Structures are given as C-alpha cells and as structure tokens.
C-alpha cells in the first residue's frame, strides 16, 4: 500500500486568482520538505527544495483562509484579525461527537444520549458557521487547497494532545467520488489528513476507503435521510492487517452519518477502533 506524505522585503507580483493558483500548484512538483517554511525571507540554505519553496512563496503569496487577501504579516498562514473570526471549539464538548454543549456537568449532547455511534470519539477544530462555510467552500470549489495548511497545523496545535492520547496508527481520509476529485483536482479531506499526518508523524492511507457512488447533496438532510443517501457508497480498499486504531478525517461533521458509514466499513475490514476528526462541526439541531 502507498503511504501519502504532505508538504508550504522584495516586491510581490500581482497575485493570481484562485483558479490560476490551483492550476499553477497542480503543474508544479511537490517539494520534498514535509513542513513548508513559515516565512518568506530569502533562504540561507542553497538546497534546491528550500530555494524552490522560497520562490513559490514570492510568486504565489499566501492568501488568508477567511478574507482571501494576501496574508499580513507576510509569512503567516492567516491574518490575525481574521483568525479571531473563527469559532474555535472549547470545553465543554460532547465526549462522543465533539459538539459544544451548554451544561458543564454534561458529557454527551442530546443526540448522543439517544444514539451511540460506532466510532469511539470525534473531535473538531471549529464550529460550522458562516465564516467557516465560506472558507471551506473556497477550499472545495475554487482550488484554495493551501488554506488546509493552516487548518491542519492549527488542528494539531490546538487538539494535538487529544489526538496523541488516541494512540492512532494511521490516518484515513473520507473519500470523495472519483469524478468529483478529478473535477477539483484533489480531495480536501486527503489534503487535510496529509498536513495533520506530517505534524503528528503518522502515515496517511488514502486507498483504505473508496467511494463507489456519487451521493446526492445532503447538507439539508436529517440523520436518517443521510444514512439512506450513503447506503453502499463506500467500500474498503487495501488495509494493513496490523492496523488497530485509525483516525478518520473529513471536512464537515453534520449528523455523523458519513463518519458512521465509513467507520462501519473500516471495522468490518478488521480495524479495531475508529476515531474521527472534522475540520468543522455543525451545532446540534
């Protein structure tokens, strides 16, 4: 099975549009470094990879995941003022699905009191509000995959202790249908998983889960409708026999139906425990 690994004062050229940036990124070989440098100052090293990374940062300056303008200060991954607009989740959260709950003495949200998921636990980075929705939409539909560098690193910075306590063996991204991946040029869950995998030192198994059916848009469906929509949508790919604990990664957690469907497939394939991470989670309906 193939293991997948992730990669990021002089005058600045006029920035390209999202679609032009996406095309340029796709036509440029991925740098060998696992962690893109955090600044755009000229590299001290004469290494080819460092020089190329510096040149790319000059030609294609970072854009903010929230406002989509060139990031200030230069070298950061998000504008400080914009970062304050993101709703980072804080305790108390549901100990199963990861949603914020109001009562500090409660461990589960109302939904998880009624329904127990097959996965052990899910956590998320931010709440799915209008700001998060716009940012994730740009990632999925305008080629702004570089926004996931920020979200993946921030996920490990803020939730890394919890993720490490799960004693994960590998990360598996939730797959999109091949036709959608060809249209976008990437699977946003895979890119997010790659960034997190590099930060955590974990392998990413993209082929462990596959999608055979293009499901209908499900953002307005309830949990039962989503489960029906996802019926037979996924199947298991090659999975190492010694893989015991897996972190399933997706961009949005709504009802948990997608995570539940993927968990069911992984458990049937021999994985012992499945944990989940979502970039954003919707509030309880």
Regions found by a protein language model. Give the residues of each.
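Glycine-rich phosphate/pyrophosphate-handling loop used in enzymes and phosphotransfer proteins
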Residues: 1-250, 254-285
């Amino acid at each position: 099975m193939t293991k997948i690994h992730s990669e990021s004062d002089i005058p600045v050229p006029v920035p390209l549009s999202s679609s032009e940036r996406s095309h340029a990124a796709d036509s440029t070989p991925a740098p060998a470094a696992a962690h893109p440098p955090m600044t755009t100052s000229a590299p001290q090293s004469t290494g080819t990879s460092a020089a190329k990374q510096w040149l790319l940062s000059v030609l294609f300056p970072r854009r903010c995941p929230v406002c989509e303008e060139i990031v200030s200060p230069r070298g950061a991954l998000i504008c400080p003022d914009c970062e304050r607009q993101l709703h980072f989740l804080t305790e108390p959260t549901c100990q199963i699905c990861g949603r914020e709950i109001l009562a500090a003495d409660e461990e589960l949200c109302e939904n998880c009191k009624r329904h127990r998921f097959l996965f052990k636990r899910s956590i998320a980075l931010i709440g799915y509000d209008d700001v998060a929705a716009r940012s994730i939409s740009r990632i999925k539909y305008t080629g702004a995959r570089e926004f996931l560098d920020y979200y993946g690193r921030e996920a490990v910075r803020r939730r890394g202790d919890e993720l490490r306590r799960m004693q994960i063996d590998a990360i598996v991204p939730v797959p999109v249908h091949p036709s959608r991946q060809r249209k976008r040029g990437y699977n946003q869950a895979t890119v997010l998983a790659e960034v997190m995998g590099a930060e955590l030192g974990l392998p990413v198994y993209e082929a462990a889960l596959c999608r055979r059916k293009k499901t209908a848009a499900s953002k307005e469906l309830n949990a039962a409708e989503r489960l029906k929509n996802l019926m037979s949508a996924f199947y298991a790919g090659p999975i190492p026999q010694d893989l015991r604990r897996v972190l399933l990664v997706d961009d949005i957690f709504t009802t948990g139906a997608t995570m539940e469907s993927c968990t069911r497939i992984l458990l049937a394939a021999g994985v012992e425990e499945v944990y989940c991470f979502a970039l954003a989670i919707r509030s309880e309906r």
